Amino acid sequence: LRLASWNVNSLKVRLPQVLDWLESAKIDALVMQETKTTDDVFPQAAFAEAGFDVFFLGQKTYNGVALCSRQTTVKTSDVVLGLPGWPDPQKRFISALLSPLAAPEQPPIRFCGGYFPNGQAVGSSKYLYKLDWIAVLERTLKTYLADTPRLVLGGDFNIAPADADVSNPEAWRGKILCSEPERKALERLFALGLYDSFRLFTQPAERFSWWDYRQSGFERNHGLRIDL
């Protein structure tokens, strides 16, 4: 199966690009972050017309996650909306079991999508919420892995795993997205048996997923790799 993750930054704006890319890249299942749409107006019909089942958990203006799977290649079951056992008004997590229709004898994959909190600033209440959120996610993944060893977690992690994922490491040292507690929390997720799939292969230097548009970051390639 070809699995992918995309911070769409408003599905209302990005829907044509998402549908085009799902087809051109032959994606079997996709987790989306920052859909920024409430469930009552989610474009479910557009995904169905394109041949996808879609599941979603949204809110107005902020956050929101979704998971879609291709009907001809994937059987989707046991959809979970939100982090189990942790009521949170912010809609940030979704997961489901995926079974490839071409190989029904294979065990299913637990496909998870997360929109990690940004944290705003080191030491702030939003930063503490971020660390708490990741701790709950860690417990959730432990439970999942006990039942389903084949697990994929994708999303906007809002953490640069290492200095190699930052265009100017010294400028970001100790700051939000790069602070030591954030990276340690991410390392604990890897310690569960997960791998950063991007780093399993030789990559060119300075490959990032986020740039600050206010400082012409994209044009200058001054960015961070915070989407895993």
Feature-to-residue mapping (PLM):
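N-terminal, active-site-proximal structural segment of metallo-dependent hydrolase catalytic domains
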Residues: 1-49, 62-65
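Active-site-proximal beta-strand elements of phosphoester/diester hydrolases
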Residues: 1-10, 108-123, 154
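Active-site beta-strand/loop signature of hydrolases that rely on acidic residues for catalysis
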Residues: 6-7, 22-40, 111, 140-163, ...
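Short amphipathic alpha-helices and their capping/turn segments at secondary-structure boundaries
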Residues: 20-22, 92-105, 136-149
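Structured beta-strand-rich core segments of catalytic domains in phosphoester-bond hydrolases
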Residues: 35-36, 42-121
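Metal-dependent phosphoesterases centered on the DNase I-like endonuclease/exonuclease/phosphatase
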Residues: 46-50, 133-226
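Surface-exposed cleft-lining segments at the edges of enzyme active sites
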Residues: 81-84, 116-134, 170-174
